Amino acid sequence: MLGESEVRDKCGIVGIYSQDKKTGVASQIYYALYALQHRGQESAGISTFNGNDILTHRGMGLVCDVFNPEKLEELKGNVGIGHVRYSTTGESRIENSQPFWSEFQGGKIAIAHNGDIINSMELREELEEEGHNFVSTTDSEVICHLLSREYDEKPNMIYSIKRVSEQLVGSYSLVVLLNQDLYVVRDPVGIKPLAFARKGSTQIVASETVAFDVIGAEHVRDVQPGEILHLNRGKSYWVANAPNTRRAHCMFEYVYFARPDSVIDGRNVYRVRLNIGEALYREHPANADVVVPVPDSSIPAAIGYSRASGIPYGEGLIKNRYVGRTFIMPTQEERETAVKLKMNPIRSELEGKRIVLIDDSIVRGTTSRALIDIIRDAGAEEIHLRIGCPPIKSPCYYGIAMATKKELIASTRNVEEIRRIIGVDSLGYLSIESLVECIGIKKGFLCTGCLDGDYPTPLPSDISEYEAMRSCSR
């Protein structure tokens, strides 16, 4: 992505239940979170039940920074949940890290959440009027308080989850820890991914299947939209929560967010991205000498474009993975410097050549010109930019912090205007129809709200107020 900081995903979640009470699950959760680190790098946390109480450790930074062997040893228990976070609502501070926990008359619950609750402000105000106290500014803590409130009234967690689901508008994949019981929830249209696996007597859920691979578990199935899974004493109970004929799987998981070695709702992400590259060539061929990806997420699409076109594939840009995110840079000049630090050209692959540059998406476009300048300074004769995601014209309200509508470069500009701003010789976006075909899930089962404004849930009554809140909390 040209300026990866332009888009941030909400989170990654993990839940593990071992039938063997002598088996500690904290280390397995740690490794699973490591595999999901790409979904969030601001904070990480793990909660386990040790037979008497829910233990939690959270911290700011990467998984490897937050946990060490001593901390993992303290988190005893055969059942637990984990979380990695990027902020889409709520500031980046320790109070907003997850898992969250809440106490009720019978004990304590802990939750980890991936998604975004559109009506969280209204729900929070309602809870505060009832006397609930909040320690964070996130929508995820609202869910935690709602569950504890419902459980106080009727101590049945399946019932409580169903009641809370009726109140939530937005996206949510949840893992809920209640003593030795683990509950797993996916929203009625399945916006965020969630999968289920087994390893012997251990059962695992996670945002992506790569979390299963690292701990040697076998992917069994996806948690279906509207399903509740209850894990207890080695058994799994699947409950239909909110049946819905519509599905709305996030298309951006396939385009950018998910790791290419994941399988999301039955679709191999790497294969989808290869398809995108092949389709880009069919829709937007170019006379060129080399196909170059913007690393890393665009590599499969570039390979696909190269195969379809017969134009050689080349690694023309090298990514420095130790540079901080460019969105923290206050001025455009500093952001452009950060791009130069993050992406360095291989002059021998670019000089005097006509380049097909493959990227997954353009959101604001604020750092795109800087990267194009880098490639031109390396001696590229022509640059033909091909984008695997159709123009992003509307914001995401479901857990991807990309931009407000006025910040989106494609919201008020056509392709030719964007081409001139970015400074490339030609620009081609994949069409929505081809993207749907590449993913292999029919359009009515994908969320394409950011592309065409067709959102799967009601939107906030005051969009401007909601977007202002989101902007201030990033």
Swiss-Prot record:
Q: What class of enzyme is it?
A: transferase
**Biological process, per Gene Ontology:** 'de novo' IMP biosynthetic process; purine nucleobase biosynthetic process
Annotated Pfam families: GATase_6, Pribosyltran
Name this protein carries in UniProt: Amidophosphoribosyltransferase
Q: Where does [4Fe-4S] cluster bind?
A: 250, 396, 447, 450
Q: Does the keyword Metal-binding apply?
A: yes
Q: Which residues form the Glutamine amidotransferase type-2 domain?
A: 11-234
- Example GO molecular function: magnesium ion binding
Q: Propeptide at which positions?
A: 1-10
The pathway noted for it is: Purine metabolism; IMP biosynthesis via de novo pathway; N(1)-(5-phospho-D-ribosyl)glycinamide from 5-phospho-alpha-D-ribose 1-diphosphate: step 1/2
Alphabetical UniProt keywords:
4Fe-4S, Glutamine amidotransferase, Glycosyltransferase, Iron, Iron-sulfur, Magnesium, Metal-binding, Purine biosynthesis, Transferase
Cofactor binding comment, as recorded: Binds 1 Mg(2+) ion per subunit. Binds 1 [4Fe-4S] cluster per subunit.
Catalytic reaction annotation: 5-phospho-beta-D-ribosylamine + L-glutamate + diphosphate = 5-phospho-alpha-D-ribose 1-diphosphate + L-glutamine + H2O
Which family does the record assign?
In the C-terminal section; belongs to the purine/pyrimidine phosphoribosyltransferase family.
The UniProt entry's coiled-coil ranges are none
Give the enzyme's EC designation: 2.4.2.14
Q: Which PANTHER family match?
A: AMIDOPHOSPHORIBOSYLTRANSFERASE
Does the UniProt entry include the keyword Glycosyltransferase?
A: yes
Which residues are named in the active-site annotation?
11 (nucleophile)
Q: Which cofactor does it need?
A: Mg(2+); [4Fe-4S] cluster
**InterPro entries (alphabetical):** GATase_2_dom, Ntn_hydrolases_N, PRibTrfase_dom, PRTase-like, PurF, PurF_N
User: Which residue spans traverse the membrane?
Assistant: none
Residues annotated to bind Mg(2+): 297, 359-360
Q: What does this protein do?
A: Catalyzes the formation of phosphoribosylamine from phosphoribosylpyrophosphate (PRPP) and glutamine.
